[in-house]
């Protein structure tokens, strides 16, 4: 008789598109681990408390948490790991004997593909586009691992950015800039952008199948702004080569695809749940094949 499998899952809203089940189920199958990963779509934040009480009662081993609940789950947990407490956002929950601990593996996952460039980032400006949990994870990763001279946070909505940073303890590292000023040609914002060693798109704009704005409405794609002294990092992972990354390649910039962060944060979550090391290369191969074929 086969042992029963422990349940892992993703908490979010309208997240049927997620590749997380493929990533974690592939890793578990490769290592022969008794876990199965599924999706839990939660329609409204008022139901989060019920969902987590059910997880405690049912012994669900753990969760990832995604849009829009990374901050909403924080007060519902028993403990917060230090890195999650630093940005008051959780993307991973571990259940041990009914006690739920929240972690944020986005910070480490974001940093991983940049570590080889750490020395060239230290003391230089960087720019992050977006005012959600992903941008805050990038900001904290830069502060922890790379020590840039300043982090320019480019946003559309000034008040949303201020709210996002309300409980963040390191605001002195950040200068908020308006995207509209950048596109209007305001000299100071264009200088901030052009001087940045790293440019990060931490918005979902550019995702395959997403309707609405083109990424050029957020990040300028002009060749004279993107240049070969920059690293351009797009958190969007489908398609693999986003419009932003294609423009960056034409400008001679080094590029980093969102696949790297996706797998980096997943690998850390996987270890927290299972105690094992994810077979990253095999998982990456499977993931890229599925994204490229759309299956």
UniProtKB/Swiss-Prot annotation:
Keyword entries, A-Z: Amino-acid biosynthesis, Aromatic amino acid biosynthesis, NADP, Oxidoreductase
Binding positions for shikimate per the UniProt entry: 18-20, 66, 91, 106, 237
Family statement: Belongs to the shikimate dehydrogenase family.
Protein name (Swiss-Prot/TrEMBL): Shikimate dehydrogenase (NADP(+))
Binding, NADP(+): 82, 130-134, 235, 258
Matching SUPFAM superfamilies: Aminoacid dehydrogenase-like, N-terminal domain, NAD(P)-binding Rossmann-fold domains
GO molecular function term, any single one: shikimate 3-dehydrogenase (NADP+) activity
Catalytic activity entry: shikimate + NADP(+) = 3-dehydroshikimate + NADPH + H(+)
Keyword NADP applies: yes
